Each structure stands twice: as C-alpha cells, then as structure tokens.
Amino acid sequence: MTSTATAEKASLDQWYVIDAACDVTSAPKPNRLLSCDLEEKRDHDGTIVVTRKGDRSALPSRELYGYVWTTLGVPPSEPVDIPEVAEADRQYVPCGPIVVRASGLRVVENFLDLAHFPFVHTDILGAEPHTEVKPYKVEIRREIDEVWATQCEFYQPQAAMTATGGIVTQYMYRVTSPFVTLLYKTCPIAANRWDVICLFVQPVEPAESRAHPVMFLIDQTTPRADIMSVTYRRWLKEKGVTYGTAERAA
C-alpha cells in the first residue's frame, strides 16, 4: 500500500469522485487517489466497495450523481448537494474522465478563469473583441464554507446547443470543496433557470489529476409525450427500485 504521508489532513478529509459508477463491475478495478493505490468493485448486492490496495477494510463511499465518491479521511459532511440533478427535464452529460498533468488545485483554478473564454473556446464561449471580464462579486459563504462568484457575465457566440445566436451569458461559480466546483449558466430556453456544469477533480499525484466533468442541462429534445416516462424513471430511482432494469443487470 502506498503511503499517504504527503497528503495533509485537510486534503484527506474530503470527498472525491474517483470513477463513473457505470464503469465499476464485480471485477476489482485499480484506481489511485492522493498517491494511494485503491481498488473498487461491486459487491454481490450491487453496492460499490472501495478499499486501499492490500487492505480489505472498506473506505467510506457513496454512489451519487452517476459517480463513485470516496475519502481517505473523515469529511465533516456528505458530498456536495446538487438539487438540480433531481429535476425531471435535465439531461445527464458526462464528459470524462480526462487525465491532466497538473495539480488538482490548478485544474480548479483554470475552470474558474473567465478570461480564457475568447482565446481557448473561440467562437463558442467567447470571441474577440469581446475579451473584457466585467466586475463581479466574490464571497466566502462562511455559514456553508463555500466560495461563490455571482453577477458574472460574458458575451458568447454559442453559449449552448440550444442557443440560436450570440448572447450575454450570466454565470455563477460555486466551489464547495478544494477539488469540487460547479458552474451555473444562463439556459437559453428556460428563463430563471440555470444549466449546471460540474467539475469533480481527482488528485492522483501532486502534479497529476483526473478531471470528471459532467453537465446537467435543461433538455429541449425530450418529446412532451416522454416527460411522464422520464419522471417515472426518476421516481423509481429515488425509491431505489432497480429490479428488471439495465442498472440491476450491470
């Protein structure tokens, strides 16, 4: 078993995404977190079990938002609450994992950088000459121990698949733990609602990470006739009913 001595207690006492839940089977699968070798597998009852390599004692774990969460320490609370995920008209769009040769903290910082839009996501999330980052509000919400940035806005030529042209997009950023951050942005088809983009960062080594981005987007493509079916499936999921489903078969 690899030592976790290089990881301080503050980093150990966090919840981390380490894999997509659909990629975990009954066969033990190696993984790595904070320089520590792990194994993950599904137990006979479908429960995901995460252990340190060479140690049969199960680590705390959760299956949440389509991902496996675990910790090497004692987190002060449960993983981040994302209430929008329970909304029936949301599309679940996983976009990873992506191996990044950088510190997990740097990956989060890059995600929070508005200024890169016109230069990295040219003609999609930004374009010259619209390069100015306008003033916005940043605060640490001590009562929930989160960092929030609000009143962010940026001109975007193609802010979303549902956008029909360039719009000034409103943003909110939410950092819920050192390696978990969420972005809320204007949804072109739903006034007063937000598309939600999450970045769950898995620090593998001090200078290597796996990024697990996922989007929960308001769905314009689901036919009205299917909305009842979608809601029924979500209701079953809330109750934990899986008998006869593809999830159970896996």
Model-derived regions: residue spans:
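N-terminal pre-ligand scaffold of iron-sulfur
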Residues: M1-R52, S57-L64, T70-L72
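C-terminal catalytic domain of Rieske-type non-heme iron oxygenases
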Residues: S3, D45, P76-A250
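A basic- and aromatic-enriched beta-loop-alpha substructure that forms the phosphate/nucleotide-
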Residues: G66-Y67, R90
